[in-house]
């Protein structure tokens, strides 16, 4: 499965939007018409290469209501983002939640999430860790196709608020830990 990951992957605003894991975005804070144009442009670029998808993942994990509206208008059904233990529905899209911590994917917790891996910034030791986890816990993984077949639950205001607060708290903790470790608080 391939998800469209933005259009240019350039952060043009300092907004966190509805899921503020970061305070920078390609989409959050951008007018609807511009978002629709960028999402459509990215989709066209993929389709010109024979790649058809209705899955989207926002760069920086940041998006707003305009993003969700533009995604629907451009034919997307899924957004791989947000926090939760199983798919949920919001604004007519099915969210496939991401793990808030990679270790949570391998614990005895019930439910499903996606694990976001930025392989381009990993060293051999980190890659080895993932290889070991995949070998040791094969029962903890399902295919993306299977994940997409799990019906999304309707999520209301309380669930959306809890997710917003959790994303905000994680962003702040990552910044504090980064400051403590001397990397300027960008958590990377």
How should these model regions be labeled?
Residues 1, 8-9, 13-14, 19-51, ...:
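Terminal accessory/targeting
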């Amino acid at each position: 499965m391939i998800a469209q990951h933005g259009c240019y992957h350039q952060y043009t605003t300092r907004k966190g939007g509805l899921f503020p894991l970061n305070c920078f975005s390609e989409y959050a804070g951008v007018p609807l018409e511009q978002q629709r144009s960028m999402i459509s442009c990215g989709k066209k670029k993929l389709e010109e290469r024979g790649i058809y998808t209705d899955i989207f993942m926002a760069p920086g994990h940041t998006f707003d209501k305009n993003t969700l509206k533009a995604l629907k208008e451009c034919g997307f059904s899924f957004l791989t983002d947000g926090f939760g233990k199983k798919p949920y529905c919001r604004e007519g899209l099915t969210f496939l939640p991401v793990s808030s911590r990679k270790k949570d994917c391998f614990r005895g917790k019930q439910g499903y999430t996606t694990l976001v891996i930025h392989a381009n910034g990993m060293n051999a030791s980190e890659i080895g860790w993932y290889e070991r986890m995949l070998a040791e816990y094969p029962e903890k993984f399902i295919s993306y196709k299977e994940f997409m077949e799990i019906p999304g639950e309707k999520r209301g205001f309380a669930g959306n608020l809890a997710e917003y607060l959790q994303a905000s708290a994680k962003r702040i903790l990552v910044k504090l830990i980064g400051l403590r470790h001397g990397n300027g608080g960008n958590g990377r």
